[in-house]
Amino acid sequence: MKTIITLIFSVFLLFQLSAQNNQKQKVTHLPVIDMHVHVSKVRPGSGPLCPWFLSNMPGADPNEEFNFANVMKSDCMDPLPAATSDEEMKNEITGRIIEKNMTLVAFGDPGIIRSWMAEVPEGRIIPGISPGKLTVEQFRDSLESGFYKYMSEVAPQYSGMSPSDMSLDPYFAVAEELGIPAGIHMGTGGNGMTNITNSKYRASLGDPFLLEDLLARHPKLKICVQHAGYPMIDNMLALMGANAYVYVDISGMIWSYPLDDVHEYIKRLVRAGFGKRIMYGTDFMTWPRMIETSMGVIEHAQYLSEDQKRDILFNNAARFFRMDKSQFDWPEGK
């Protein structure tokens, strides 16, 4: 009799746990794709961050020590706290992936990327890889392995190079041949990047027009101009008009520069007819709540229709990666 009672109780618990699990997995959010997530070990001592911290850049003098605390402000009403450990970061990010029905395009430390992937449903993290110090053969092997789906983040601007520099051309040729899209950093790098942080950096090398020779050599290469070439909107629009496979992500600028200017930049892209080629992204690094902050910029943009918001938050990126929308989780009735 005791055995039967134990068996019945065990079956009851099994059904209860199954019901709870199904309830937890119930989808309530429309899918979102974040095109720009950096993955690395947590840096000890990282402080909190105020969104749109570059809204009032400090005056500075070369005879005075430059204090980054004056730029990376944390004196606002609700600063974003930094993750304090790799485990905390993993839990914060994978929890958001599930809760907010997100897919992240992530690049950086492959070991950490794999550990995140193990915690979320299949396909919810899309790994990217930059050529970095890889030979062309090593880069090809990495892409042909099937693990990496994106060539990113390619950032020659920080090395004082144009994206059309011929030293990079064999890597882009491999991506074009294999049908792998590429993400290229173009635009600003932050306050004092050249004279304080990186003497090789040149603002002029973020000009979207510098992509023209690359695109002419590789007409079937699909690219994402990361950070949307901010603040060079006129050249960005002209490049997109001349090249049908150029998309942009609005990462980085979306949480750092003055919010009014960010909205105006996005508005210009939409007004010029490129609403189908703008993709949401955070340029995520250290602060988990940056995801909600960045997403809110699009969700609360009154100049965007609901269809335009869905294009930016999901549809355009799904098309960019040639994804089947039926493979995503959707709320009931959607």
Identify the residue ranges that each predicted region occupies.
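Active-site environment of divalent metal-dependent phosphoester hydrolases
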Residues: S40-V42, G111-R114, L134-T135, S159, ...
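Active-site gating/metal-coordination segments in enzymes
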Residues: N21-Q25, D109-M193, K200-R202
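Mid-to-C-terminal alpha-helical segments outside catalytic/metal-binding sites
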Residues: T3, A19-D78, N91, F274-R277, ...
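Bacterial N-terminal signal peptides
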Residues: T6-Q16
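Divalent metal-dependent hydrolysis catalytic cores, especially in the metallo-beta-lactamase
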Residues: C50-E87, E92-G111, I125-S130, K149-E153
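Aromatic- and acidic-residue-enriched segments that line the glycan-binding/catalytic groove
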Residues: G45-P58, E119-I125, N198-A203
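Catalytic pocket-lining loop regions of alpha/beta-barrel enzymes
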Residues: K149-Y150, S164-M279, P331-G333
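A cross-domain feature marking catalytic cores of carbohydrate-active enzymes
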Residues: V37-V39, A106-D109, I129-P131, S152-P156, ...
